[in-house]
């Protein structure tokens, strides 16, 4: 945050939450930072994603992409630049944040409920237990719109050719 907010004084993390059932690719933390700027006390909530200690669950897709946290940040940044789906504001990617000794990035916090990865949100949790059919319909339709938006990105024009490990212009899936 000191890079993102160089004018901030007395910057500190005042709240920290580690959700237990979200994020297979990287670990998720939710934190609130406070600081002073020109004599005014400010605070903001963020979501952090950090590289798992064990290196993550996905195989390396190609040399130079060993860090899934880097891959996620770079793709999210491109998706945000394309403006095809709502996406939180991203902060910088940190290759090896000294205080946690891992790769890390943060983004703005968006209020809402987080569907669980374990147990699957389609089996247990708020979506099954307390959502109305209309709320489930909205979630599914919003998800489909987001997927369609992402699939509308012209990957070469968006600068994603670095994902093509085949080098042929026809990426392996």
What are these regions (language model features)?
Residues 1-18:
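Juxta-kinase regulatory segment immediately upstream of eukaryotic protein kinase catalytic domains
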Residues 17-173:
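ATP-binding pocket architecture of kinase catalytic cores
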């Amino acid at each position: 945050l000191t890079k993102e907010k160089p004018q901030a004084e007395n910057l500190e993390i005042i709240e920290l939450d580690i959700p237990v059932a979200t994020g297979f690719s990287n670990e998720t933390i939710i934190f609130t930072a406070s600081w002073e700027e020109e004599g005014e006390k400010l605070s903001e909530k963020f979501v952090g994603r950090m590289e798992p200690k064990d290196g993550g669950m996905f195989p390396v897709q190609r040399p130079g992409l060993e860090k899934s946290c880097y891959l996620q940040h770079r793709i999210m940044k491109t998706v945000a630049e394309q403006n095809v789906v709502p996406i939180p504001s991203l902060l910088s990617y940190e290759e090896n944040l000294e205080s946690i000794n891992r790769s890390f990035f943060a983004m703005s916090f968006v209020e809402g409920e987080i569907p669980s990865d374990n147990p699957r949100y389609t089996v247990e949790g708020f979506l099954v237990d307390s959502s109305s059919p209309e709320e489930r319909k909205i979630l599914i339709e919003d998800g489909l719109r987001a997927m369609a938006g992402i699939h509308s990105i012209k990957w070469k024009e968006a600068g994603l050719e670095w994902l093509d490990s085949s080098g042929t212009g026809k990426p392996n899936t």
